[in-house]
Structures are given as structure tokens and as C-alpha cells.
């Protein structure tokens, strides 16, 4: 019975490996095909291929970077900026995405949200890096505390190290919260419509607060039906039609 169960488990593992390998091979082939469409100047076809990969969950910084380039070549600066931002959300230090993002912003005259002073100081690392630091600090502190509990003599160095590890974990958790809730955090969205008006109320006839060029940044505060209430550049707030924006985080 044990031998039969082992054989079944082995067959399942082989099948799963084969399926996963086939899926990766297929996505690589589709990505290569999309790149070929782009190289041959068929940008709309390349966009369709890249978007299909994104919808299937095959996310990578290079996929969104290439998708941003394709949108840029069609003159859709809003979606170009959106996808450069998505590339940077996955890989913070992507120099090509940083450079092209700035070019697209200049072309579109897009408005940016200004980070708070705490965000500016914390932006040398990403949320993922702070999360890793928090987990590492927490577990190092736990091991030190367990060691102190069972040790015959409590070392001052071990106590200091465990305290330092807990401090690192706490500060890293605070950094994750600040960045996630900040101007570049989970609520960040990009204006994809053209000459979008932020209004005082949820009506097309309401007075305009600010005209937002494509690619402008907003921070979503709440949603009411087809409208989004958002923090805007220049420390303003207003209502925007949801169809004219897309969140950076998927």
C-alpha cells in the first residue's frame, strides 16, 4: 500500500511539474510574440498580447515596462505612465522604467502627488524589503528571548541584541504602514482619461476643482457608485469618474 501511494504521489508530482513547465513555456512564447509585434511596429497588436499576459497573472516588471512602451508609441500617455508605475511597484530599481516614466510625464504634463516628509525618508527601500526586515527582526528577537529563557546566565549582549531586533521589527512595520498608506501606496491611481475634471460633487454639472491631464496621480479615498473621491495634486480633493482612472496596484 505504501509503495502504491508513493507511486501515485510521484506521478502527481511529475504531472504538476509538466503542467507548470508547459504554462511557463507558453507564457514565454506569448511574451516573445508580443515583443516581435512591438519590434515590427504593430503596437496595438503588441498591447493586446501584453494585456492578455497581465490578465492571466503573468506579472513582471519587464512585462509592464514593455506594455508602457507600447502605449507610449500609440500616444496613450496615461496608460503608458500607469504601466511604468506598475513596473516600478514590482521592481523599484528599474532605471529604464524610471527614465521613460519621466519622459511620459513631461509629454503629458502629468501632475504628481507630493510625498510626505516621512515617505521621502523611507523611500530608499521598498515595502517588500521593509517586510523582510520586519520578519527577520521579529524571528531573531524570538530566538534570542528563547535562548535567554533557557540560559543559565543571561548575557547583557543577548538582551541588547534582542531589544535591537524588536526595535528593527517595529520600525520596519511602521515603515510598511507609512508607505502603504502614503501617496505612492495601495490607493495610488493614475488618470487614464483625457483632460479629466475633478469636481466638487458627483455630477457632471458640478464645478471643477482641477483639470487632470492623462497620467496624473491621485490617491483614492472612497468610492461612491461610478465616482471616486480622491486626494489630488496641489493638496486638493475632488470627485472623479471611476472609468477615467486605474489603480497602480493590481
Task: Spell out what each predicted region is.
Residues 110-150:
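Membrane-embedded alpha-helical segments of integral membrane proteins
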Residues 161-193, 200-203, 207, 231-250:
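Boundary regions of SH3-family modules and the immediately adjacent low-complexity/disordered segments
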Residues 210-242:
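SH3/SH3-like beta-barrel superfamily modules
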Amino acid at each position: 500500500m505504501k509503495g502504491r501511494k508513493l507511486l501515485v504521489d510521484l506521478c502527481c508530482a511529475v504531472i504538476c511539474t509538466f503542467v507548470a513547465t508547459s504554462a511557463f513555456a507558453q507564457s514565454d512564447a506569448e511574451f516573445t510574440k508580443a515583443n516581435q509585434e512591438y519590434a515590427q511596429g504593430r503596437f496595438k497588436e503588441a498591447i493586446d498580447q501584453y494585456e492578455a499576459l497581465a490578465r492571466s497573472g503573468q506579472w513582471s516588471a519587464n512585462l509592464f515596462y514593455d506594455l508602457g512602451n507600447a502605449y507610449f508609441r500609440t500616444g496613450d500617455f496615461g496608460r503608458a505612465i500607469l504601466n511604468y508605475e506598475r513596473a516600478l511597484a514590482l521592481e523599484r530599481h528599474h532605471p529604464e522604467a524610471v527614465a521613460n516614466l519621466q519622459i511620459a510625464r513631461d509629454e503629458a504634463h502629468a501632475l504628481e502627488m507630493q510625498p510626505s516628509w516621512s515617505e521621502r525618508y523611507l523611500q530608499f527601500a521598498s515595502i517588500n524589503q521593509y517586510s523582510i526586515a520586519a520578519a527577520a527582526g521579529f524571528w531573531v528577537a524570538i530566538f534570542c528571548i528563547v535562548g535567554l529563557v533557557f540560559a543559565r546566565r543571561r548575557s547583557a549582549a543577548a538582551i541588547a541584541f534582542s531589544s535591537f531586533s524588536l526595535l528593527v521589527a517595529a520600525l520596519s512595520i511602521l515603515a510598511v504602514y507609512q508607505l502603504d498608506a502614503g501617496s505612492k501606496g495601495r490607493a495610488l491611481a493614475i488618470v487614464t482619461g483625457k483632460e479629466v475634471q475633478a469636481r466638487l460633487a458627483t455630477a457632471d454639472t458640478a464645478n471643477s476643482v482641477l483639470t487632470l491631464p492623462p497620467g496624473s496621480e491621485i490617491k483614492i479615498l472612497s468610492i461612491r457608485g461610478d465616482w471616486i473621491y480622491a486626494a489630488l495634486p496641489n493638496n486638493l480633493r475632488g470627485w472623479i469618474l471611476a472609468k477615467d482612472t486605474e489603480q497602480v496596484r493590481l
